Amino acid sequence: LSWREMFTDPKLQSLIETGLERNIDLNVARLRVEAAEATLLTTKLSYLPSLGLNAEGNANKHDGATAKTYNVGASASWELDIFGKLTAAKRGAAAALQGSRAYRQAVQTQLVATIADSYYTLAMLDAQMAISNQTLENWRTTVRTLEALKKVGKSNEAGVLQAKANVMQLEASLLSIRRSISETENALSTILAMPSHSIGRSNLAEAVFPDTVSIGVPLQLLSNRPDVRQAEMELA
């Protein structure tokens, strides 16, 4: 199942695409794969013959005239892999390449998961802030109502103070939510290798969540994990 099939929210897909293109860790992993591919190619070339060219020239005089002749010879030689040195090097390079590819896949998988987690966290924080704002307005209305009732002797100071305490508590909660949103946006911007900015996102009602993944990981599925495959390649 590809990440596009798992995460179908268009705005989230756009963020993931940006992350896959710009993330520094993933680009480093790509360079590791390219280096491993170059090493494997070098070991394969070791099986080819080494070529040599020999050039000779002579000058002979005959009846006052000088005749020049040139000869170019080519030779080829193979290094005998008597002790399996070349074969071992090739196998090691192939294992290193597979390990690098598994590492790149592990980085990519973690990157996609982190971006998605941050995205849905922001959507939930937005929903929480909307609810808190509405609740705050309701309590402010309650305070005004209780103060009006107090003036006509139908409420007391304790009720007003309790309502005001609830207002202050909600105001503090909203500050905390805004701070969490800012911190999450900054962290996600860093992952995307972009300056800190407001992250475009769907609201919680519109956000498309992936289907629930069943709990429990069979051994066959565990062996397909990129980080597990990388460890296997490094131990090979």
Give the positions of each predicted feature.
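A short structural micro-motif
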Residues: A35-T39, V167-L170
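Periplasmic alpha-helical coiled-coil/stalk elements that build and connect Gram-negative outer-membrane
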Residues: L86, A102-V217
